[in-house]
């Protein structure tokens, strides 16, 4: 099995097993698995409206860790570290619902192919309707608006405006 295929399978399996156990007020934002330095790390990103505390991550680790042990056969090729953490200020926007919730916020969008000779945009998400993001961004010193089809978005996340 190819490495990226194995990682995708692990992420899908883990998500399917832990998602039902992460209940309100918590939200499962993302699951990532990969090598950091010489160690494999399974990162589980969670959030809640008022933000995640250290105690929240400890409690969620106690819920998630035993669930991972129930996955048979064991999908992990090596020992790994489990990291339960907040998505941070630049949280990923991986679903249409997450993009919809980000309307009015400053975001970073990467595209599969160029639009107006650009593959990356940062700006305020004005609206998300009918699978189109309307983004207001700065082009040098001028404000511009662009409509980006959701199907062109390779990656989107909240961004910090400087």
UniProtKB/Swiss-Prot annotation:
<dbReference type="InterPro" id="IPR003728">
    <property type="entry name" value="Ribosome_maturation_RimP"/>
</dbReference>
<dbReference type="GO" id="GO:0005829">
    <property type="term" value="C:cytosol"/>
</dbReference>
<comment type="function">
    <text>Required for maturation of 30S ribosomal subunits.</text>
</comment>
<dbReference type="GO" id="GO:0000028">
    <property type="term" value="P:ribosomal small subunit assembly"/>
</dbReference>
<dbReference type="Pfam" id="PF17384">
    <property type="entry name" value="DUF150_C"/>
</dbReference>
<dbReference type="InterPro" id="IPR036847">
    <property type="entry name" value="RimP_C_sf"/>
</dbReference>
<keyword id="KW-0690">Ribosome biogenesis</keyword>
<keyword id="KW-0963">Cytoplasm</keyword>
<dbReference type="GO" id="GO:0006412">
    <property type="term" value="P:translation"/>
</dbReference>
<dbReference type="InterPro" id="IPR028989">
    <property type="entry name" value="RimP_N"/>
</dbReference>
<dbReference type="InterPro" id="IPR028998">
    <property type="entry name" value="RimP_C"/>
</dbReference>
<comment type="similarity">
    <text>Belongs to the RimP family.</text>
</comment>
<dbReference type="InterPro" id="IPR035956">
    <property type="entry name" value="RimP_N_sf"/>
</dbReference>
<protein>
    <recommendedName>
        <fullName>Ribosome maturation factor RimP</fullName>
    </recommendedName>
</protein>
<dbReference type="Pfam" id="PF02576">
    <property type="entry name" value="RimP_N"/>
</dbReference>
């Amino acid at each position: 099995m190819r490495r990226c295929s194995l990682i995708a399978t692990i992420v899908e399996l883990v998500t399917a097993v832990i998602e039902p156990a992460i209940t309100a007020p918590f939200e499962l934002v993302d699951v990532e698995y990969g090598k950091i330095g010489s160690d494999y790390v399974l990162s589980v990103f969670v959030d809640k409206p008022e933000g995640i505390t250290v105690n929240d991550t400890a409690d969620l680790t106690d819920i998630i860790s035993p669930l991972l042990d129930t996955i048979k056969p064991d999908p992990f090729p090596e020992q790994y570290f489990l990291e339960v953490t907040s998505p941070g200020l630049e949280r990923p926007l991986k679903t249409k619902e997450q993009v919809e919730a980000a309307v009015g916020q400053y975001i970073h969008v990467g595209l599969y192919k160029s639009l107006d000779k650009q593959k990356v945009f940062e700006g305020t998400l004005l609206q998300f309707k009918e699978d189109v993001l309307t983004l207001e961004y700065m082009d040098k010193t001028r404000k511009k608006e662009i409509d980006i089809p959701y199907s062109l978005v390779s990656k989107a996340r909240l961004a910090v405006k400087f």
